Amino acid sequence: MNQFIHPDFKLNGKSFSYIELLSEALYLKENGQLFEKNIGKFLLEWLNNESFVLVQTSGSTGKPKKIVLQKSAMIASAKATGTFFNLQPKASALLCLSADYIAGKMMLVRAITLGLQLDTAEPNSNPLGNKKYDFVAM
């Protein structure tokens, strides 16, 4: 269903075709650190032939549960965020949230959809280091 990858999209400095991104996702899922495994798992779900992804709610308003999100709605949200923040292709972005949760998943969707150059970092209290980014969700 979702084979579109913006030509300007980069993950940790590397460009990917659809097949290459699938391969990278599988590698991360099998061999990465925990935060990278979560990225790999989500990318595999994002790139599959289903029209939806399953997302675990946080439980902040009740019992945690799995919900279905349509990929088309996630793409529309990514585009709306890009418009609101005037994010242009090749803008730098940082994923420093777990891809186990919607905020981290949406950073990946935004990067793939808008052509952002996304760096990933293990979630911690000081993820930025010395690099400046155009867009970071924290």
Language-model-derived ranges and their functions:
Residues M1-K37:
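N-terminal leader/targeting and accessory segments in enzymes
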Residues N2, L47-N48, N86-K90, P127-Y133:
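Flexible, charged surface loops at secondary-structure boundaries
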Residues F35-L43, N130-A137:
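Short, well-ordered secondary-structure micro-motifs within conserved domains or adaptor modules
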Residues K37, K41, I75-K79, M106:
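Short, contiguous clusters of charged residues that form electrostatic/catalytic patches at enzyme active sites
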Residues N38-V55, P89-K90:
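Conserved pre-ATP/AMP-binding loop-to-beta segment of ANL
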Residues S51-K79, N86:
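Conserved AMP-binding A3 loop
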Residues K71-A76, S92-M138:
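AMP-binding/adenylate-forming
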Residues T83-L87, D119-T120:
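Long, mid-chain structured domain cores
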